[in-house]
């Protein structure tokens, strides 16, 4: 079933989970390479914030905000859900939304990724003090989810769900960059959870599992 078109890029933090979800639900979704604040005039007219990802359905339906897109994809393809990804009742649905909102709005936030992520990728000049201060702030924010997953294999129930697909894929922004070997030892439960979900979500289809020994900043 052709569902529509995603506008983003393949390795975008908030897009990988959508591509894998579409695959798991046998939904055909095209991907048009698009970058934030560099939308075409026509696309910018539809989505003036120019934030990724955005989606336009085959029927012209326009949708932004990643959690809304996850929900829409699942509703369209849940008859093909062979993995038990979705909720079985209202309680599970609420719990899945809770975890997705937590990682999206409380952990992967501008306050927690700027300016270190731009410096790490070489998009802006490296400055030691703001890099270290912002990276430390981000790592501190991960101490809470580290404790929350201490006694959990999965976030909701005893199976891999939408919450794990979403949560695990968003964690990559930290684990492939500022979480070095020393920091992984300080976040043992989150590290174990991330590696497990990386493989369960088949994220190696999109990029390798990267667990750096040390933090290496790209040269601009």
Swiss-Prot record:
Keywords: Cytoplasm, Transferase
EC number: 2.5.1.18
Domain GST C-terminal, first and last residues per copy: 89-216
GO cellular component terms listed in the entry, alphabetical order: cytoplasm; cytosol; nucleus
SUPFAM superfamilies: GST C-terminal domain-like, Thioredoxin-like
Group of enzyme by EC: transferase
Domain GST N-terminal: 2-81
Function, as annotated: Involved in the oxidative stress response and detoxification.
Protein name: Putative glutathione S-transferase C1183.02
Species name: Schizosaccharomyces pombe (strain 972 / ATCC 24843)
